[in-house]
Every structure is written in C-alpha cells, then in structure tokens.
C-alpha cells in the first residue's frame, strides 16, 4: 500500500521567478505526494547547501542538477522503501549525500523528496498532513508573525532592519488573529498613502516604503494598529527581524546601519534594542546580532532575554548542533525553523523537539522565495509550535499558508487552540 513506486522531480518557479525543485512521490496504492522547495534571500553562512547550476541559464539560478540528483540518484534508491518510514528515508538520503551540509545532492533535492514522501504517506492513509506528522495531539494554531514593512535585503529603501512584523496575541482564535493582522495591513496601506509613500509590496507581501529611519517604521505601524481599532501592546505586539549579519562589517567588527548613517558596536546595538523595547511593544527580535557574534548575542540575552523573545535564525540555522551550543551558552531563547536550512523533515522535527526540551520557543518560518506549497502550515500545527512567520496577508505564496491554517482550525473545530500570548511561554511577562 505505502511502498514507493516512483519519485520524480522537475524544475518550476518560485515567487521571485527563480527556479526551484518540485518533487512527486508515487505509492503502490496510487497515492501521490507533491512538494515544492522554498529559497532564501538573506542566507546564514551555516545553512545546508541549495544546489544551483550556475552558467547563463536563468542567470545561473537553474536547478537542473538538483532535479537530476532526485531523478537519477535518489529515486532508484528509494523505490521499494515504505513511505511510512520517514526517519529511515531521510537518514538514507543523508547517507547518500555523505556531506555535512548536503552539498553533494543539494538540500533542495533532499528536502523536496522528504516533504513529498510525508505528503504521499498522509494521502495514502487518508489523513491530513498535520495529523499524520503530529498525531491526535496536534491542535494548537500558531500566532502569526506578519511582516508588514520590509527593509534590508528584502527591499530597496533606507530601512536597515529587514522585517517589521505584527503579532495579534490578543485574538481568541487563529481566524480572528488573521482578521486582525489583515485589517492592520490594509490600515497601514492607507497610512502610508496619506504620507505620500509608495505602497508597492516586497518579496514577502509587506510594504517597502522609503522611510527615513527604523523608528519611523515602528511609529507608522503603531499608527496603523490604532487606526484599525486595535490597542498596541495589548491586542497586538510588534516583532522585528534585524538580519544583523547583513549589517555586520567583518573588517571593522561593527554594524553599519547605512540608512541611519550609524556605525555601532555589539554593545551599542544591544543598547539600541533596549531603547526600542522601552518605547514600543516589541515582543520578539530575530538575529539581533551577527551569526558569529556569540558574545553580543549573550549580552543581548542577559539584558533582554526575560522579556523579549530572542530568535536565532542565521545564528542556529535549524541545526541541532548550533542550537545545542546556544542552549549551553545561554544564547537566545527561541529558534526559527526553516525546513530548507537543514534539508529533511526528520532533522527539522529534531530541532523543534530540542528547542522545546530546553524551554526555547520554535517559530516555523517561510523563506522570501516561496511557492504555493503549504507544508509549513501543517508543520506548525503538527508540532504545536505556537508561532508561524509567513509574511503579510498579501501575495498567494504567503496567503496559501494562512488559508491552510484556516482550513485546519475549521477541521479541528472545538479541539482547536489559539494560545496568543501564552505561546511565549518562556518570557517573564
């Protein structure tokens, strides 16, 4: 019934018009699972390798090598495997690749297969993916972390911080949270328009206006929240992804906030965050310092770790070895989970489990280059992660995840839980 009979990959396009890998896995029963692989713009130094072809085709971004690796190398190995053996299949692909960073076959090849196998198995058993992956206890809907103003690598403007987000923590359900976030998004558009700013959207569906400073972004969002009829700090909190590795200059060891004309040391960056947290209802800061600035991260954790979620993205790259190092050193209190940073579902689930055991939160995340694939929505519920970061309520590649979460909440009925502020279980409120 669940024996794999065929594995097939093709090259398709992601939301930025760049090629990516799509994989289909076919089972004896006739069931099929399909998965598409996402891709990031600002990538951590220690991420698993995304295989690109180079050359002139698609400006070097083609993925025919990764597709060939699925069709010629991985497929013959997996035919005959039971799709229910997710751990065995993922382990076999890791061994087949044989490198620390999946650089031989490509994390984009391996991940596509890993996700498609899970979907095929769920379809064969006639189970929703979140139930197949998480069992009967999978019932917590995540608080959305909605990126509504873009800066940094995600936009061409004077804003240094990559993402300014809203989190509707005061809602009673996911449906209400999504409505809150969406109303604020539309309110923000009006506010920006009234100030004469551009309202075109960036990679993740958020606006990318040419604001004069990072603080103006926060002030504008507060205005939008209030104009939408919500209370900042109570019903809606703010979150930021600084993506500091993009601001860090290795030569002088300083952070260059070119939009503001500032050059700051690690200590000055921490002081900058303390100032912002004192002024605005910020509940989460991601990658506040460079991925190799462990001393700076420790300082930030010591100063703000009790009241602000400090998320490691480039810092931990969904990697249990990096996360273990962070836990041991008391660095950060949360991990961002991106399936393509590590490359298999098994390793993704291992990272989430390790984080939770250590009292860290886990935030399930999209990438800036996304597709219509909504697997991460199911993963968020399957693992009861409590938080999801998947862009603004704009662009189908982002909304696909939100719509899937609405379906899941509907399906769960009275069993569905939305924990709001309780999702930040390790903060001393």
From Swiss-Prot:
Keywords of this entry: Cytoplasm, Glycolysis, Lyase, Magnesium, Metal-binding, Secreted
Keyword Phosphoprotein (UniProt): no
Its biological purpose: Catalyzes the reversible conversion of 2-phosphoglycerate (2-PG) into phosphoenolpyruvate (PEP). It is essential for the degradation of carbohydrates via glycolysis.
Superkingdom: Bacteria
Protein name, as recorded: Enolase
GO terms for cellular component: cell surface; extracellular region; phosphopyruvate hydratase complex
UniProt organism field: Halalkalibacterium halodurans (strain ATCC BAA-125 / DSM 18197 / FERM 7344 / JCM 9153 / C-125) (Bacillus halodurans)
Pfam families: Enolase_C, Enolase_N
